[in-house]
C-alpha cells in the first residue's frame, strides 16, 4: 500500500492551483461511524461567480467535525470529535498548515482538549490561543499557540489552567429535555471582539456561560456571568454582530433564535426570541436547529433547520436585536448541520450531512433573501464549511 506521505504528495500534484477570484473552502466531516469520508476536504470557490470545484481530500483526520482558521497565519485547526485518544480520555484538536497554492493540509501538532467529544473550535482575534468546546465532557479548553501557530499542551490544573468544567445543577427542573439535557453539554465557544471574554453555549444547561480569558497565559477563569435561556431551549451556536454589541443564539431543541445585547457585565442581556420556522409548521417532531450566522454587512441573520431542511432568513431591524422573519429557503441538501457565508458576502454554502452534498446560494444584497444557484457538489458526510478568516476577525 502507498504510504501516507506518498498519498499527500499525489494529492498536491493533482490539486489545481488557486486562481484569481478563487478562494479555498474546507469541509469538515464525520469519518465514523460508517461514512465514506477520510478527513478534511478542500474545494476552490469563485467569489464572483459562485462556482465550486470538485473537492479533494486535503488532510486525513478522524471526525474533523468543526474547523477554524488562524486570523494571520496559513493554519487551520480541527477538532477530532472522539471520546478518547491513545487510551486516554478526551478528544483532540489538531493544527494543520495550509499550502497556500492548493489548500492542501499538512498536520503540524495535535493536543488533548481534556474532555470527550469536542465539537467546536475557534481562534481568538489575535491568533494567540485556540479554544474548544467538549460536548460530551461539558467543558471548555484553551490552548496556547506558538509563533508558528502550532498547539501547546493544555494545562488543566493550578493557576495557569486553561480548562473549565461546567457544573450540573438542574435535577428535577421542569421543562427540560431529559434525553438531551442530562448533564452539561458545551456546544460552541466564541471569543468576544475585544478578546477578554469567552462565550460558551451549553445545550445541557440552557445557558451561555461567560468566562474571562487571559490570552497571554492561555487561561480561563471560572464563570463570570451566566446568561439563562428558556428551559428546554438547548442553546447551540452564537453569532456576534460586526458591531460587537449584539448577538443571536440559535437554540437547537426548541427551534428558536434569541437576541442578545451587551451589558455592563461581561456577558449579554436577553431580548426577544423568535421561531426559525413558519407558523404553519406545527409538528416539529424530529426537527432541530444547527447553525447561525450574521451577514458581514450586518443587516441579515440566517439559521439552519434540520429535518425541515431549510434556512431561516431574517432582517435585522435597525440597531436592535429584533429580527423580521423573511421566511425559509429549502437547502436542497439533507440535514443542514452547518453553513458559511463566503468572503465578499455574495454567496452562502450549506453542508448537507445526510445527503453528502454542499449546495450554493446567492444572497440578495438588498433583501437578504437566498436563491439556489444550481451548484451542488458531493462531499462525504459534510458537517462544517470553513473559509480563511480576515485579519482581526
Language-model-detected regions and their locations in the chain:
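Short glycine/acidic-enriched loop and turn motifs that connect beta-strands
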Residues: 31-35, 82-86, 136-139, 205-207, ...
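Beta-rich, blade/repeat-based domains predominating
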Residues: 34-37, 61-71, 114-125, 166-196, ...
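Short loop/turn segments immediately following beta-strands, especially the blade-tip
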Residues: 44-50, 96-103, 143-154, 212-219, ...
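A short beta-strand motif characteristic of beta-propeller blades
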Residues: 53-59, 106-111, 173-179, 222-228, ...
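Blade-loop segments of beta-propeller domains
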Residues: 53-123, 127
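Asp-box/WD-like beta-propeller blade repeats and closely related beta-sheet repeat scaffolds
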Residues: 103-187
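Blade-level signature of beta-propeller repeat domains, shared across WD40, Kelch, NHL, RCC1
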Residues: 353-359, 371-393
